[in-house]
Amino acid sequence: MQNIYLCLTAFARGTYPDDAAIAGAFDELMSGDAPDAAIGGFLVGLAALGERPSDIAAGARALRSRMTRIEAPVGAIDTCGTGGDGKGAWNISTTAAIIAAGAGATVAKHGNRAASSKSGSSDVLAQLGVKLDCPPAAVERSLAEARVGFLFAPAHHAAVRHVGPARQALKVRTVFNLLGPLSNPAGVKRQLLGVYDRRWLVPIAEALRDLGCEHALVICGQDGMDELTTTTGSDIAELRDGDIREYSFHPEEAGLALVREADLQGGTPADNAAAIRALLDGQQGAFRDIAILNAGAALVLAGLATTIPEGTSLAAAAIDDGRAKAALMRMVAISNGEA
C-alpha cells in the first residue's frame, strides 16, 4: 500500500502527491488489500484539497482497468450522469436514452440504483421488465437490435465493492461520486453527462478529454438538476475534438415552456415506470418535454442532429411514431432471453 501512504503523507502536509502516486493509490484502493482506514483517509484527503481533472481521470482509469467490458457499435453514446442532485425527479436520462435509441442513436446506458432519489435507472428499468443481470452477450445483442442496452454498474465494476464500506462510513461525497459516468463498460467516446454541481462542469470535461472522449456535453441545470432542465436555463461544458467551450441553453430555444420543479417530481420505481409507459404512449406534459430535450442533446452527440432544438424535434417524432416504445420493448425482450 505504498502509494496510498505516500498520498496520505502529502495530504497531511496540505500538498498534492505526484500523479504516479495518485494513480498507484487508486489501483491499490481497488485491489481489495487496502484497509478501510487508509481508503477513507485517501478519499477525504483528496476531497479536502479538491479533486483535479487529472485525479478524476486517474480514478476512472483504475476503474476501467478492472471492469467487465462489452463491445458496442462505433459511435455509441451514454446518457449516464452523476446523480446525487437531491431533486427526486423522474428518471430523465434513462427515458432520454430510450427515446434517443428510437430516433436512431445507439445508447449504451450505464447506470445503478438510486443515489438521492427513490428510483435509480436500474430500479425503473427493472419495473419496466428489463432483466438487470443478463450476460454481456445479451447486452451487446440489445445494442445491435434495439439500439439501447443497459449496463448495470455492479455487474461490470466488481472492484468498487472494496471501497464500499469506507464510503458508507464516511457519509460524504468523494471522487467516487464522479467516477461512474466516466467508466462506461462499452468504452463509449460520446457522452451526455449531467453533474450535481456546476463546479464540476469543466473539470469533468477536462477529465473526459484526458480519457480520450471525442464529444461530450457536460450539463447542469441552473436549478441544480443533473440534466438539461426545463425550469430555467442549463449550463454546458462541451468537449469536442479536444476543445472545451462553455455556454448556456434555455428550453425556450427548443420551443419548450418553463415548468415548476414540482412538475418534474418523480416517485417510486413503479410510479416512474408507469410515467415512462404513458410518455411513450404519447402523453403530453412536463415529463415528455424534459425527456425529449435531453434526448435531443443525445442525438447531437450521436451525429443525428446538429443542434439541441433539432434533436428535440427528432426525439418527439420518435415517440409519436412509436419507435421509442418499440426500442424499449425490444430491449426488454432481449434481456429476458426472447428471440
From Swiss-Prot:
Binding site for Mg(2+) 1: S93, E227
GO molecular function annotation: anthranilate phosphoribosyltransferase activity; magnesium ion binding
Entry's EC annotation: 2.4.2.18
Known pathway: Amino-acid biosynthesis; L-tryptophan biosynthesis; L-tryptophan from chorismate: step 2/5
Keyword Transferase among record annotations: yes
UniProt xrefs under InterPro entries: Anthranilate_Pribosyl_Tfrase, Glycosyl_Trfase_fam3, Glycosyl_Trfase_fam3_N_dom, Glycosyl_Trfase_fam3_N_dom_sf, Nuc_phospho_transferase
Record flagged with keyword Metal-binding: yes
Listed cofactors: Mg(2+)
Keywords: Amino-acid biosynthesis, Aromatic amino acid biosynthesis, Glycosyltransferase, Magnesium, Metal-binding, Transferase, Tryptophan biosynthesis
Binding site for anthranilate 1: G81, N112
Cofactor note (record): Binds 2 magnesium ions per monomer.
Binding site for 5-phospho-alpha-D-ribose 1-diphosphate: 81, 84-85, 91-94, 109-117, 121
Superkingdom as given in the UniProt entry: Bacteria
Assigned GO CC terms: cytosol
Subunit structure: Homodimer.
Purpose of the protein: Catalyzes the transfer of the phosphoribosyl group of 5-phosphorylribose-1-pyrophosphate (PRPP) to anthranilate to yield N-(5'-phosphoribosyl)-anthranilate (PRA).
Similarity comment text for this entry: Belongs to the anthranilate phosphoribosyltransferase family.
Designated name of the protein: Anthranilate phosphoribosyltransferase
Lineage: Bacteria, Pseudomonadati, Pseudomonadota, Alphaproteobacteria, Maricaulales
